[in-house]
Amino acid sequence: MDILLEEVRKVFGNTDEGKLAERLIVAYRQRGARGAREVLKKYLEELGVDVADIES
């Protein structure tokens, strides 16, 4: 298991913040900053924030 993800799980547990942190880490590793940005935009949309004006 990945040490960073393991530590995130220890600190945040199965909270929304922990899940977001895990998704951001995985996205960054797979697609770099653009991938992390996409995950963050999707998360903000789920919270009801208007992200239409944010550049991709």
UniProtKB/Swiss-Prot annotation:
Further facts: Belongs to a conserved five-gene operon within Thermoproteales denoted Arcade (actin-related cytoskeleton in Archaea involved in shape determination).
GO CC, alphabetical: cytoplasm; cytoskeleton
Organism of derivation: Pyrobaculum calidifontis (strain DSM 21063 / JCM 11548 / VA1)
Keyword set, alphabetical order: Cytoplasm, Cytoskeleton
Subcellular location: Cytoplasm, Cytoskeleton
Role noted for this protein: Part of an actin-like archaeal cytoskeleton.
Record flagged with keyword Transmembrane helix: no
Protein name: Arcadin-3
Major localization listed first in the record, in broad terms: cytoplasm
